[in-house]
């Protein structure tokens, strides 16, 4: 037993020799190249002054601290809230929301805090699980109350922002009741915070702004102002620019429930603007571009007086002066622009609101002049770089609405400017200005169609598709027409609507050479290829529109061929290969038209649907057929 007894400290005392003795001992009796085995190097802490204390071992790595681990007494690592939030988010991203809810409810109480519950509530709202999100909110209130915590402002903000994403409130009436309840709970939360700390960061009106957006989507305009007048006039809970912006946006969402139009909303917006100026002077907040743009949109659908007031806001805050003349494009708008009367730099959403004001007030010339003024503005005040595709398409629609000579030429210049601007911009933002099918369709099917301008239509077709219409002209025919291979998204395939417009423009130009050029182009593309679905998930509406324009194109082709046959002259007689091409086209379009007529002549079978009789309450059968 003495052998297994605990040895004393003196037994294992090691006398460390001096450095010179260690060196001699290491070289004697050891072959060359061999190493002496030794224990790992450790350093003792200098803090252990008492000889009875055990020295604290420090590892070599200065980045490792074993005492920094959040461990229990038994050595288990505790679950931290941020790790739990990451796990919950990963489950929700994978569609396992119910599993995430079960994980949170079964997690340790130390890992459950308000931000973790907010994370899961937001994930449920993103997945449109609105009922589950509200149940989590009520459950969180009970669980947090037991531990001395309560939902914070971020909780109410998360709930309101998620509910404001609902578009059809008629099918979510229960969620509207929940929104009212959440707003009342938030106001109680604000009152409790103000009693303890009047300067707390929890005092924010962001949830109220989201609640006002919900009220505007439902059309409860009177309730919006009830909320507005219930707020403080001064302090952190006074109306600010975020809340007032939400109020203007709510007035422009739905018409007034009593009158059924936006005239009363515009008058209310004018009153609200005066309240905005008073609140700005009282609370010292700055009026920004979002606030002014929202006010302009709310005023744009009102009376002429309200619209004139909106144009005054455009001039005061953005420096765009409405033109004086009404007969054409006013060059004075550009000269007035140099006065620098703007106080807010123009942004894309602000310019979109201004163009919407011009459209709603039926003043398309104002939109054209404002666009020209923005092209000459410096970038520091909102120059050409803020213009995107939607702005240009709005100007193209303004060109359609006014009777300006050579509007198709001006429209083509706009599209060419878009393509040049796309090259200048970085690739990350270049797509916002790139013309799409809608842009080219406005130019060809509407603007060029009104003027029957074949030259501009052919140039626009080249820019859109990558073809060269020059290869289909008389005397310039190519057996293999050129097709430019450009980067992805720039070549747009021709559709039946575009080709039908091209055929109508050629016929309207009363030029036989243009008609022949259009027929060669259509024959090369092929009418049958236009009837094929563009993708497997093509909607029924898109399919019906495609067949409609194919039928319209077929009628245009027949009309063009008849013109060429009926009015030919000895000097303008069709060639043999053109005659073969037209015969092929005529046979193809007649087959398409006969097929369409057969579909329209189809008589559907009569189906029966039970209809309840109001007299005796018994269900009877009533014959229903498609109206002729």
Predicted region positions:
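A basic, Ser/Thr-enriched alpha-helical scaffold prevalent
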Residues: 2-628
């Amino acid at each position: 037993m003495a052998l297994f007894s605990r040895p004393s400290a003196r037994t294992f005392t090691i006398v460390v020799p001096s450095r010179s003795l260690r060196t001699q001992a290491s070289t004697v009796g050891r072959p060359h190249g061999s190493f002496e085995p030794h224990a790992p190097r450790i350093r003792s802490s200098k803090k252990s002054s008492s000889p009875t204390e055990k020295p604290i071992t420090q590892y070599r790595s200065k980045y490792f601290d074993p005492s920094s681990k959040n461990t229990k007494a038994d050595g288990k690592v505790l679950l931290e809230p941020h790790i739990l939030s990451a796990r919950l988010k990963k489950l929700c991203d994978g569609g396992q929301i119910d599993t995430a809810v079960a994980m949170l409810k079964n997690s340790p109480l130390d890992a459950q805090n308000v931000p973790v519950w907010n994370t899961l509530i937001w994930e449920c709202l993103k997945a449109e699980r609105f009922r589950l999100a509200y149940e989590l909110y009520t459950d969180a209130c009970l669980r947090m109350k037991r531990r001395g915590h309560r939902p914070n402002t971020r909780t109410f903000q998360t709930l309101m922002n998620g509910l404001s994403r609902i578009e059809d409130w008629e099918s979510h009436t229960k969620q509207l009741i929940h929104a009212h309840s959440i707003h009342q709970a938030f106001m109680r939360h604000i009152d409790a915070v103000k009693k303890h700390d009047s300067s707390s960061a929890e005092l924010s009106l962001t949830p109220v702004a989201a609640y006002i957006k919900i009220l505007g989507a439902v059309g409860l305009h009177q309730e919006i102002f009830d909320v507005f007048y219930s707020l403080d006039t001064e302090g952190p809970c006074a109306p600010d620019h975020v809340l007032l912006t939400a109020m203007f946006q709510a007035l422009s969402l739905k018409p007034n429930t009593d009158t059924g139009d936006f005239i009363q909303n515009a008058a209310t917006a004018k009153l609200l603007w005066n309240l905005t100026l008073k609140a700005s002077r009282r609370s010292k907040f700055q009026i920004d571009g979002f606030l002014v743009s929202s006010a302009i949109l709310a005023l744009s659908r009102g009376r002429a007086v309200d619209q004139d007031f909106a144009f005054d806001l455009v001039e005061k805050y953005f420096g765009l002066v409405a033109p004086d003349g009404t007969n054409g494009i006013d060059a004075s708008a550009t000269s007035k622009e140099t006065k620098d009367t703007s106080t807010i730099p123009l942004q894309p959403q602000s310019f979109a609101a201004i163009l919407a004001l011009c459209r709603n007030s039926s003043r398309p010339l104002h939109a054209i002049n404002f666009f020209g003024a923005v092209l000459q503005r410096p970038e520091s005040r909102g120059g050409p770089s803020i213009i995107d595709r939607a702005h240009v398409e709005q100007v193209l629609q303004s060109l359609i609405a006014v009777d300006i000579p050579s509007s198709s030429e001006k429209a083509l210049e706009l599209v060419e400017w878009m393509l040049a601007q796309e090259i200048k911009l970085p690739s990350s933002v270049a797509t916002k200005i790139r013309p799409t099918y809608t842009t080219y369709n406005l130019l060809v099917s509407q603007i060029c169609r009104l003027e029957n301008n074949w030259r501009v239509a052919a140039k626009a077709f080249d820019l859109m598709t990558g073809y060269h219409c020059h290869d289909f002209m008389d005397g310039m025919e190519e057996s293999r027409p050129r097709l430019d291979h450009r980067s992805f998204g720039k070549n747009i395939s021709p559709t039946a609507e575009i080709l039908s417009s091209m055929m109508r423009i050629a016929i309207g130009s009363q030029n036989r050479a243009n008609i022949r050029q259009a027929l060669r182009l259509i024959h090369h593309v092929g009418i049958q290829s236009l009837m094929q679905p563009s993708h497997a998930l093509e909607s029924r509406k898109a399919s019906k529109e495609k067949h409609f324009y194919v039928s319209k194109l077929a009628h245009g082709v027949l009309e063009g061929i008849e013109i060429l046959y009926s009015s030919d002259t000895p000097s303008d007689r069709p060639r043999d290969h053109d005659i073969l091409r037209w015969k092929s086209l005529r046979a193809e379009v007649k087959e398409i038209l006969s097929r369409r007529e057969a579909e329209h002549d189809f008589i559907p079978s009569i189906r029966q649907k039970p209809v309840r009789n109001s007299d005796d309450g018994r269900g009877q059968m009533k014959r229903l057929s498609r109206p002729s």
